[in-house]
């Protein structure tokens, strides 16, 4: 069945946040978990998942009352407890958020009038790192990634992803399955870093281009990463 294609310019929802629990205030399942590593998919703060693949490194993940003033009392903290000194090609460490198709229709993906999307968030770390945020279209296996930098102070990042216009791929499914997956890449092997970051536009997925240019949270037991205040809105 061919999905109906409509003009997205009529959407009234510009500016509304599509991320649920971006302030990391709710952690009903896992407020604190230690020794996370190997190949693991683990819920942390509600709607957020730790997704690791084949790494020897280990981390502790906690909901922490250390959010930036005026933004959120809480944040998610990831603390490296065991380093990974020999990185295999297929390794990955991702903080993931899924968005249901019925909640992202306002983007108008793949149709005339498709919208840009801006994702903003607050981050800090123990040092300066480059990590990546990937906007992954799970319905069509298309993606676009952006690098962002950390400092030792809370910094607001604002990353604008281009409209994925009518290119022959389909709109997002209008249902409760995950159509958009936000991947915060914190560590990756060469399978995901050996290409050129797919940053200027959306394209059919090539793994080597998903996380090129990132550092590794697992390079030292001194390393930590904090995030909160995540928002995703239509528009630049």
Question: Which residues make up each language-model segment?
Answer:
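Extracellular and organelle-lumenal recognition/adhesion modules and their flexible linkers in secreted
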Residues: 2-236
């Amino acid at each position: 069945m061919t999905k109906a294609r409509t003009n997205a310019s009529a959407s009234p929802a510009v500016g509304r946040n599509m991320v649920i629990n971006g302030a990391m205030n709710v952690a009903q399942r896992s407020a604190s978990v230690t020794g996370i590593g190997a190949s693991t998919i683990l819920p942390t703060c509600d709607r957020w998942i730790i997704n690791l693949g084949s790494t020897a490194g280990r981390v502790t993940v906690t909901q922490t009352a250390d959010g930036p003033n005026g933004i959120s009392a809480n944040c998610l903290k990831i603390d490296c407890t065991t380093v990974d000194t020999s990185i295999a090609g297929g390794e990955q460490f991702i903080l993931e958020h899924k968005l249901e198709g019925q909640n992202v229709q306002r983007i108008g993906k793949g149709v005339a009038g498709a919208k840009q999307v801006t994702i903003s968030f607050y981050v800090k770390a123990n040092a300066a790192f480059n990590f990546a945020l990937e906007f992954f279209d799970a319905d069509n296996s298309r993606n676009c990634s952006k690098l962002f930098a950390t400092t030792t102070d809370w910094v607001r990042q604002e990353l604008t992803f281009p409209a994925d216009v009518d290119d022959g791929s389909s709109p997002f499914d209008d249902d409760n399955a995950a159509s958009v997956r936000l991947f915060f890449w914190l560590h990756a092997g060469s399978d995901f870093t050996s290409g050129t970051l797919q940053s200027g536009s959306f394209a059919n997925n090539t793994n080597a281009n998903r996380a090129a240019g990132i550092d590794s949270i697992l390079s030292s037991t001194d390393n930590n990463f904090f995030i909160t205040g995540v928002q995703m809105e239509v528009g630049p």
